[in-house]
Curated annotation (Swiss-Prot):
Gene Ontology biological-process annotations: microtubule-based movement
Cellular component terms per the entry's GO annotation: chloroplast; microtubule
Protein name: Kinesin-like protein KIN-7L, chloroplastic
Family from the record: Belongs to the TRAFAC class myosin-kinesin ATPase superfamily. Kinesin family. KIN-7 subfamily.
Binding residue positions for ATP: G146, V147, T148, S149, S150, G151, K152, T153
PROSITE patterns recorded: KINESIN_MOTOR_1, KINESIN_MOTOR_2
Organism: Arabidopsis thaliana
Bias kind Polar residues: ranges: 1-12, 563-575, 864-876, 958-967
Amino acid sequence: MGSKQVSKTRNGGFSKLKTVESSASSTTSSSKLYQEASVDSHSSPTSSSVRSKPQLPPKPLQSKENVTVTVRFRPLSPREIRKGEEIAWYADGETIVRNENNQSIAYAYDRVFGPTTTTRNVYDVAAQHVVNGAMAGVNGTIFAYGVTSSGKTHTMHGNQRSPGIIPLAVKDAFSIIQETPRREFLLRVSYFEIYNEVVNDLLNPAGQNLRIREDEQGTYIEGIKEEVVLSPAHVLSLIAAGEEHRHIGSTSFNLLSSRSHTMFTLTIESSPLGDNNEGGAVHLSQLNLIDLAGSESSKAETSGLRRKEGSYINKSLLTLGTVISKLTDRRASHVPYRDSKLTRLLESSLSGHGRVSLICTVTPASSNSEETHNTLKFAHRAKHIEIQAAQNKIIDEKSLIKKYQYEIRQLKEELEQLKQGIKPVSQLKDISGDDIDIVLLKQKLEEEEDAKAALLSRIQRLTKLILVSNKTPQTSRFSYRADPRRRHSFGEEELAYLPHKRRDLTDDENLELYVSREGTPEIIDDAFIEEKKTRKHGLLNWLKIKKKDSSLGGSSLSDKSSAVKSNSTPSTPQGEGSDFHTESRLSEGSALADQIIETMENREAHEDSFHEIETPETRIKMIDQMEILREQQKTLSEEMAQQSRSFKLLSEEAAKAPQNEEIKAEIINLNGDIKAKNDQIATLGKQILDFVIASHDELDKSDIVQAVSEMRAQLNEKCFELEVKAADNRIIQEQLTEKTSFCEDLQEEVANLKQQLSDALELGDINSVTCHMQQSSQSPNKNEEKVIEAQAFEIEELKLKAAELSELNEQLEIRNKKLAEESSYAKELASAAAIELKALSEEIARLMNHNERLAADLAAVQKSSVTTPQGKTGNLRNGRRESVSKRKEQENSLMELKRELTVSKEREVSFEAALIEKIQREAELQRTVEESKQREAYLENELANMWGLVAKLRSQGAANSGLSDSVSETRIEHFGT
C-alpha cells in the first residue's frame, strides 16, 4: 500500500529508525510488512533475519472473501429541488438499487443506505470490521467513490454533529487499545494527496512531488513524513492541519470541491505483554482511509485550471475502473497498475492479503442519472474481486527465543505427563498374568521410552539454539548489518528518557532458563521470574490509555510525548557550559570500559578455570546489586538531562538579556551541579568496576563477558548521547555568540543615536549657545529633547501606519481580484442570458408573423363568407357545412396560437426581468470595483504622503546634524578667543 513509505534505512534484523526528524516525534521512514514465516527447528535463530528466514504464504484468517461494497444515497439538494429534479434511482430494500424509469435495471450489493441513514450506521456496516482487522494485524483499506458533489468527503470526514468514517475509525482504534491490556500498541499516521498526478505530503508542506518506489516488499512513497500519535485528538489535529494544504476549488456543481485524491494511513504496531501463546510475535498492519476526488461530468462547463484538474481526475478514475475490470476478468494476463499513481499505490490493497471496503456515494437526481449508473456499474464490478485476509507477523531473534522457551515448557509438561502415564502401566504389568498383555505392555513401554528420548533430544537442541541466539547478538550489537529490521519509531537513544524504560529485558531472558555445566537445563524459580515481569514495562506500555483516569490520560500522554520530543531531537541545544562536561564524560566512559576489559583479561590470564559452580541464588543477588547501581546511574543521568534543559532555557534568556547578572550566576551554579553529577556518575562507574572485580571469583566466565558487554553497550549508548549533546552545545554556543555580537552592534547603534541626540540638543538657538556654552554643556535643553523624542515617536507611528496601509492595500488587491472574477462570471451569465433572450425574441417574432398570417386568412375567409350570394349558398348545403367545420378548426387553431403567444410573451417578460436583474448585479459589481479602486488610490495617496512626511523628517534630522557641525565650529572659535 501507499503507506509503505521508506527512506531506505536498513540496520539489521528489522528496519529500525535511528534518527528523529523533528521535535514533534515525526519520522520520515516507514517499515515493511512481512508475513508470518515458519522457522526450521534445525537452523540457528541467530542467522535468521526477516529476509533470510524462509517465507511461506501467509496463513489466512478464513477462506477467500469479496470486497465489501456499499452504496449510499444522498438527499436531493435545494438546487435540484428548485429545478424540479425527479428521483431516477432508489433503494429497493437493504441490498438492491433499482432504476425508477426501467424497473428491470437493478444491482445488488452488500448494503444500500438511503438518504436518511447516518454516517454512524454506514461505519458500523462498511468500516468497523476493517478497523478491527487492522488492530489485529490485517491490512485494511476503505475508500469512497462517486461523482463530484455526491457526498464522498462528507462520508469520510463528516462534521462536528455527524463525524465521518475517519474520525470514527480513529476513535475505535484507541478504544480497542484501551480494551486490549495484554498487548501494547504504537500508532503512526501519514497523510498525502495526489494532485494532477503529483504526490504531495499534507503533513509536511515541504514534501512536494514525492516519488513512488518499489522493492521486494511492494510499493512505497519515498520521504513521506509520519507522526507518532498518542490520542484521538492528536490524530484529528493532524488531519485538520493536513486539510489546510489540500487542493480545493469551486465548480459549477459544488462550491468547495475536492480537486485531489487524499490517502490517510494509520500504521499499527503491537506486541504482546509478558508470556503469550504465539511466541512474542509482533503485529504490523496499515489502515488506509482514502477520499477520492469526484469524476468530472461532461456537463460541467470548466476551463483553464479546473479543466486540467478534471482531466487528471478522470484519467486516474478511469484507470482504476480498468484495473478492477481486469481483476474480475480471470483471463486477463496484465493489470495496468502503473498507468496512474492512484492505482499504483492501491496495488497491494486490491491484490493483496487485506480487507477492502468500497463506499459508493450516489445522487438520485434525474439530471445525474447517467453518472449514477456508471458508479453503480463500477461498484458491481468491484464486488467480484476476491481477497484473502491474513495477519502480518514479525518474529525477531528475541521473539524466537521466547517461542523456543515456550516450546521447551510445553515439551517438559508433555514429558511429565508421559512419566505419570508410565507408572500405572508398570502396575498393570505386575498385576496381569496374561502373556499377551505383558507383550503389549512392553511394546507400549518401549514406545514411551522412544518418545521420551526424542523429547529430550529436542529440548537439548532448542537449548543450544537459545544459547547461540543469546550470545550472538552481544557480539554483533555494534556492528553494521545490511539486513532490514522491523521499523520502530523510537530508537534506543530516544527510549532512554521514557519513564518506564528498563534495561532488564535481556536479564529477563537470561533468567528464563539456567543451563548448568553438564548441559542439563534448569528452570529458575517461577516466583522470581514473575516478580521480574511485574517490574518490567514494555517499550510501548507508556502509550496505553487507562480506563479509570480517562480525564487525566490525555495530559499524561501529552507530557510523555513532550518528554520524547524534547529528548529525542538531535539538535536540542543544551547550553554553552556543558561541552567540556560532555567530553569528560565521554573520556570517562570509554576509559571505564577499557579498564573493565583489561582487568578481565589480566584475571583470565592467571586463572585457568573456576572451581565453584554458580547457583541461581548467587546470580539473582548479583543481578539485583548490579541493577541497583544501574538505577542510580540512570537517575543521575535523568537529573542531568533536566539540568541540561534548564541550562538551555537560561542560555536563551542570557542571549535575550546579556547584562543580567542573576542569569549568569544561575548558569554558573548549573555548571557546578552538572560537574558534580558527572563526578557522581564517575563514582558509580568506579563502584560498578569494584563490584565486578570483587565478584569475579563468584561469576562464571560467560556471565562476566555478558555483563561487561552489557556495560560496554550502556557506556557506548551514553557516549552517543553525550556526542549528540556536545554537538548541541556547540550549536547553542554559536547561537549565543551571534546573539552577543548582535547585542554589541545594537549597543553601538544606541550609543551613536545618543550622541546624535546630544548634538541635536546642543543646537537650539545659535546665539544662546555662543553666549552660554558652558551652561548649555552641563544642562541640555529638555524642551528640544522632548521635541526630538516626539518626532521619533511620530516617525515610528507613521511607519506602523504605513505598514498597516500596505497590508490593507494588499487585502484590497486580493478583494479586487475576487470581484474581478465575479464580474467576469456575471458577464458570462449576462451574455448567455442575452443569447437566450435573442433566441426567444426571434421565436416570438416568428410566432407573431404566423399569427398575422392566420389572422389574414381568417379575415379573408370571413369576407368571402359575407360576400357569397344567398342563392348559391342555398343550392350548396354540403359545401356550407364544410365551410363551417373549417371555420371552427381555424378558430380553434387561432385560440391555440393566442395561448402560445401569451405563454411566449410571459416567458419573454420573465427573461427580460432576469436580464434586468443580471444587468443590475453587474452594475453593482462594477460599482463595487470602482469603489475599491478609488479606495486603493486613496490609500496609495495616503501612503505617499506618509513616505513624504518621513522623508521630510529625515531631511530635518540631516539639517540638524549640519547645524550641529556649525555649532561645534562656533564653539571652537569661542574657546579660541
